[in-house]
Amino acid sequence: MGKYFDMLMEDVRMKEGLHSCMNCGVCTGVCPAAEFYNYDPRQIVNIVQTRDDDAIEELLKSDTIWYCGECMSCRPRCPRGNTPGYVIQALRTLSQKLGFFVESEKGRQQLALKRIIGENILRTGYCIVPRLVKPELHPEQGTVWQWIYDNDKEVYGQFTPVYMRHGAGALRRLDEQSLEDCLLYTSDAA
């Protein structure tokens, strides 16, 4: 009993985020995610404090830990100085480390997002590249996005004179050497 709790306590965010929760519920009362989901940060902290491996494992495999928007509204309001947002960040990290996130739909969505952003960074040097957000893959963006996509040089040219061209400035095309350096840096870090 407590092996997952011990693993969580190795994360500095747990040491900063969990002192001694008294279950007052202020964190849940101010949580924006609790307005949209069946989500209760107080309950998550309560489960973690029990040190019950089965209950913590259930959390690590659930969508619940992925509902938090990490706004940290909970941080300044807790009368005991807890930060449920930090506890949830530590839970997410452990879920990823143990591979439990794949049992959660929201966890799998995070993986897909991480892959897309990572691939964009390695290909272009940017997290989000407007040219790679294809209108046919994102119909929710509507006709305005189609127009922006079709006229990107004109639209983004208003913000930067070097849109997807070499030079200094935002949204510039990075030279191949810089992109290779990014790739070397990320492979060295792994």
Question: What annotation goes with each model-predicted range?
Answer:
Residues 157-174:
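A hydrophobic membrane-anchoring alpha-helix module
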Residues 185-190:
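Conserved small/polar residues in nucleotide/adenosyl-binding loops
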Residues 172-183:
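C-terminal helical accessory/scaffold domains
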Residues 16-35, 62-82:
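Cysteine-centered iron-sulfur cluster-binding motifs in ferredoxin-type domains/subunits
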Residues 1-13, 36-67, 81-146, 162:
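Ferredoxin-type iron-sulfur electron-transfer modules in oxidoreductases and energy-metabolism complexes
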